[in-house]
Amino acid sequence: MESHLNEQQISDFRDAFSLFDKNNDGCISREELATVLTRLGMAPSQEDLQDMIVAVDEDGNGTIEFDEFLAIMKKKLYENDKGDDEEELRKAFRIFDKDDNGFISRNELSMVMASLGEEMTEDEIDDMMKAADSNNDGQVDYEEFKRVMMSTWNITEIFKPHVTIWRYKP
């Protein structure tokens, strides 16, 4: 089993961490965790959120720092084989890639999020694009999309066992 993450993996996990760390203070609070999970379509209770924090919070300070986040992501990365998810990812990418040019534009992202009932501000759309567009070309290719989605799946898999009931928003 691989025991070290490469620089790209660490960078990807730092990007994922920053999506949660809304105030950029270097830690994920219960409120920040709730915000992101709600955007992912989940509605965990306050008790569920506390259980999630406790499961990852090694130093017991009530928040998740990057080193704690990285340790659990590394563990999950090597526990899970995501090979079966490749076709699902390609299908999801095609849903976003409305003009079928191999890229997701900001406009396509905005349209799909709106069609899913996600009311997002222009700044939130910009933040999503910035987080996904690692080569800064103004669009998201399949590999960038896959990186973000795999990080999201790993994150939800980490927290799922600690939630008593996942309530998905209609």
Curated annotation (Swiss-Prot):
Ca(2+) 3 binds at residues 97, 99, 101, 108. Keywords: Calcium, Metal-binding, Repeat. GO terms for cellular component: cytoplasm. GO terms for molecular function: calcium ion binding; enzyme regulator activity. Ca(2+) 1 binds at residues 21, 23, 25, 27, 32. Residues 8-43, 44-79, 84-119, 120-155 form the EF-hand domain. Ca(2+) 2 binds at residues 57, 59, 61, 63, 68. InterPro entries: CALM/Myosin/TropC-like (IPR050230), EF-hand-dom_pair (IPR011992), EF_Hand_1_Ca_BS (IPR018247), EF_hand_dom (IPR002048). The keyword Plastid does not apply. Ca(2+) 4 binds at residues 133, 135, 137, 139, 144. Pfam families: EF-hand_7. Potential calcium sensor. Belongs to the calmodulin family. This is Putative calmodulin-like protein 6. The lineage of its organism: Eukaryota, Viridiplantae, Streptophyta, Embryophyta, Tracheophyta.
